[in-house]
Amino acid sequence: MAEGKQLPMLRPEKNPGQAPIFQRVGIVGLGLIGGSIALAARQIWPASLVIGVDRKDVLERAMVLHAIDVAADDAVVLADADLVILAAPIQQNLEILRELSENVTGAAVVTDTGSTKRAVVEAAAALPDRLTFIGGHPLGGAARGGIEHARPDMFTGRPWLFTPSKGHDAAALEKLKAFVAGLGAVPQALSPEEHDRLLAFISHLPQLTVSALMHVVGEAARDEGLSLSGRGLQDTTRLASSPADIWKETCATNADEIGSALDALISVLRQLRADLKTGKSIDDVFESANLWRETLLSNKGS
């Protein structure tokens, strides 16, 4: 990030709120997720200092929204932070991690919000002992990104996954769990490997499948054909509006697991293709899909 000049501090009058879990919360990346964390943290723990690091145009919007107390476009402002949240895109988080020990001078808990975990956990292994890294992934979001779409209730009732490494600091994990529970989220812990395997199936595969489906349908049907489509196609392809740049990073950092998930889907599609006339595979796949769909909806309370 450019010049490293701190922007003006902005601390309007606050309500007393809850006693802070962390005193100085540094958030690198004030997009949809980072911005929502900032908004919620300032509401819930007004005695905490929320420090935002991003481009100056983003910081200016964040200050107008009262999402942060201190703004800077350089990570040196994180020197005294006791919690650092890396909420930038995955590759940028990896770059920030490499220099974090130079910017954060004291002891701190460090976490991230990326959708893949093994790469960032491996990179964090090089951090000094005073910086305790525990990977994180809030399973919340919205159709549109950017701090202008951030909401303090973004994480209410949503899972927030943590991926502690072997021999992790149990006290740091408990503080992080308390922090995200304060944001309204439901903290859960699993290994980095299991996280990436599960997310490949429940998130990454659906995204690639929907994007591929919309590509094939659009190329075949064109404008005239799409004008005849019903609500089903719109509902099914909602994820096709997702930005490619974010998903390229996701695929690059979870290629093996996503590849396995794609292989599983391709195998079923081949079954269906080979059995179109008799319909045996269609019966089996539809029956299984109906049952798993009911399970999905019941788990979501729908």
Where are these regions (language model features)?
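Rossmann-like NAD(P)(H) cofactor-binding subdomain of soluble oxidoreductases
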Residues: 96-150
